Amino acid sequence: MSRRHSAEKREVNPDPKFGNIVISKFMNSIMYDGKKSVAENIVYGALDTIEAKTKQSPLSVFEQALENVMPTIEVRSRRVGGATYQVPVEVRSTRRQALGIRWIIAAARGRNEKTMTERLSAELLDASNNRGNAVKKREDVHKMAEANRAFSHYRW
């Protein structure tokens, strides 16, 4: 890993339907092999399903789900002497968002519904109500940080 230049952030265009950058990032994370149209169909299908089920704005449900999944603190390994400590550190806002998106997608892919659209809509609904595997993942990360609070003075 080069220490000379940090990679510059690329501009992400907002999605065509809602004009939302976060939804666009979400689609890009779902996408396999550059098949954006498939990813769009999955995400928009899931959001339409959410709207039909809840009679609420799908965007507000999505944002609530993401907010409930994003971690505020995580642990990072730090080597001190011969020992490796799990040191709790705060998570930057960009990483919080990326982790939240990643965890929702991973949890949706691990579900048992038939199509990805159904899985994603179910996981987003669960996450917006503080349930589901994505929220459980965040709770586990927070528990790890809480358990290792004694090492917080090793922060960098």
Curated annotation (Swiss-Prot):
PROSITE patterns, A to Z: RIBOSOMAL_S7
Gene3D superfamilies: Ribosomal protein S7 domain
Gene Ontology molecular function terms on file: rRNA binding; structural constituent of ribosome; tRNA binding
InterPro entries registered for this protein in UniProt: Ribosomal_uS7, Ribosomal_uS7_bac/org-type, Ribosomal_uS7_CS, Ribosomal_uS7_dom, Ribosomal_uS7_dom_sf
Gene Ontology CC annotations of this record: small ribosomal subunit
Keyword Glycoprotein (UniProt): no
Record GO biological process: translation
Annotated keywords: Ribonucleoprotein, Ribosomal protein, RNA-binding, rRNA-binding, tRNA-binding
Known partners and oligomeric status: Part of the 30S ribosomal subunit. Contacts proteins S9 and S11.
Cross-referenced PANTHER family: RIBOSOMAL PROTEIN S7
Entry similarity comment: Belongs to the universal ribosomal protein uS7 family.
Function recorded in the entry: One of the primary rRNA binding proteins, it binds directly to 16S rRNA where it nucleates assembly of the head domain of the 30S subunit. Is located at the subunit interface close to the decoding center, probably blocks exit of the E-site tRNA.
Protein's UniProt name: Small ribosomal subunit protein uS7
Gene expressing this chain: rpsG
